[in-house]
Amino acid sequence: MPNYDLPGVEALREMAADDSGSIFAPKSELDDFRQVFLDRELSWLAFDHRVMLEAAERRLPLYERLRFLAIWASNLDEFYMVRVGGLVDRDQLQPFKADIVSGLTPRERLEAIGRRTSVQLKSAEKLYAQITAAMRGAGVEILQADLTDPVDAALCRQQFEVIRPLLTAQVVPAGKPLPFLRNKEQAVIAILSGGKRAELGLVPIARLPKYTAFHVNDTIKILPTAELVLRFAEEFFPDREVEEARLLRVTRNAEINMQDLMAGCEADVRAVMERVLRRRRRLQPVRAQLYPDASKRLQKRVAVGLQLPPERVFVSTFPSDPGFVYAMEGEIPDEMKRTITAPAKNVALQKGDYFSYLARHDLLIALPYQRIDPFVDLLYEAADHPQVESIHITLYRLAGSSRIAAALSYAAQQGKRVVCVLELRARFDEQNNIDYSRMLEAAGCEVIYGLTDYKVHTKLCLIARRLPQGIAYYTQVGTGNYNESTAEQYTDLMLLTTDPAIGRDAAKVFRALSQGETVPETETLWVAPEGYRSRVCEMIERETAAGADGYIAIKVNSMNDPEVMRRLIAASRAGVEVRLYVRGICCLKPGVEGYTENVHIRSIIGQYLEHERIFVFGRGERRRVFIGSGDLLLRNTRRRVEAFAEVRDGVIQAQLLHILQSMERDNCKAWVLNANGSYARVTPGSAAPYRSQAALHDYFAAQKIEKPKPPQPVQKQTAAPQPVQAPPPPPKKLPWWKRFWNWLMGK
């Protein structure tokens, strides 16, 4: 039997109370709202489906359409690794316990997921065939194992001889489990005959380039390495007859309970995380993919060999590993790719200008429409400024070659105190963060690994500068990671401010994190886990009390917190206009009579990944606007450290409102959630097409930030000086006898 690392019962119980709501919770008033709630997992799959359908947009360049298919497949990988893995664990623990939000048992959810996956695979097959046929007609051909062209065959043979020494075949006796295959690793699997019993052959394909490109006449031929190995499968088993050979890819569970492992390990958190990563590599499989087709016999052998139920062995003509799509981008002609819109260089500030500018104005950076450079420049300005004493920052996901990490290291080398709260548990970025923790420590930064029970997901940076009158705080509150790569792909916001209340709260957050504690009370920041959901609910209740005069607009990535959704239902019933912009998971149905008639929900799927979080409550003088790092998932409201700041600057408020208004106007990339739980694409009809992301790029490019003007010198007087009048002379002193006489006479 393979040594799959199965979580214990206590770990399963912890997993069972995650983002989908406490499965062990008793019945409550939430049962009354079941008809307006959607299942979290099926909502995730609905989001993936919207991403896939971008590949059907004929107005997009061909490679862009193919890339959307690859994004869909990558999302599905993560879904199975994270969500299906957790559901499998729960199904083992209490298979009949229903989810508190959707009312479905783990088994029912797994079955529904399997059906949805099969339907999406069929759509992906058709789209992939259409797109690759169109690319072939335009001069880019993706070769397959069953090619017949003699020139292509000769090229394949030549390339196979190059990689053949790097591949090793294995024979698996009948009835034995399959050898260990790494997560998302491909292998050729074959049914072999010629021995006593039918056996399986396996050729793992790992650590090889994803593809090879050939330029033949005017055609670019892309040969995926997996297709190449599949073509020559018989040559790995010369003493056997290969009855059937296909590509196999295994997806493994990535859900591992870290809380118990992290408890009491403050002395060496990094070593524990490295042990966790090694352990995760051997978790049980949750999905198998066979390409391009497979007999029932082979499907059964794979299911038995991997200890998988048959319904989680998927057969499809869509490539099981579309990683070659990303890798081959450099081979694709420009006319097949989208035009890259460069971020606007509209912030005229340079290093040395930021402190003086921020002393007078708040600054908003809207990514990717504007560059992230101003924030990097601010860090370098702080590093070189003699009055700066410290820089504190939370780090969750850093770029591969991070200029921000370099700036922090430079500041430490310049003698500044640099404190980095680095979250090692950022899923799938753990090793990257471990590497950066060593680099930052080597540069002289103080690295803190956050809290045992809560992930530190907040995006906060605090610069402390000593002035004659006291400490001045320069605070950055953001919605996205300090990551230059995603800053070009995700829509995010950075607010830079010298608001003293925000600075004091940020200092309180960092003091608490340094002491291994959460933040119970703040002046103005909303800080999860204690002060985020409660503040959101308070603001919703304020608008509920206003009735038809109330207004709520919320933009987040995902939402499934039942308490927040219950408050939104109450607001809708009170007549409050509720507009939600939820890109991904959304577990609330709008437009349900008696519940959510006044709730409207949109999702934008475009060139950039919508990622900023914006909360607006009220209109006019009652309006309050907040931005921050957290979604409205239970994991954000209960088990993470998040931070939101109120935006008081009128100009920046207007910019944030413009973002929401643009999303409301979008009639090309918007989807509307209906009362039955389905999504419908918004189309222009007779109106002019309006794409919010393109419009926002133009809008923020026009928001010029000029350098602060130097103080004007005191003007010299140019008018002629006025003559100064002499004071009147003192009165003349009288002789003594005259003064005596005046005294006698009473004068």
What is each of the regions a protein language model found here?
Residues 2-552, 570, 574, 586-747:
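N-terminal localization/anchoring segments of enzymes in phospholipid and broader phosphate metabolism
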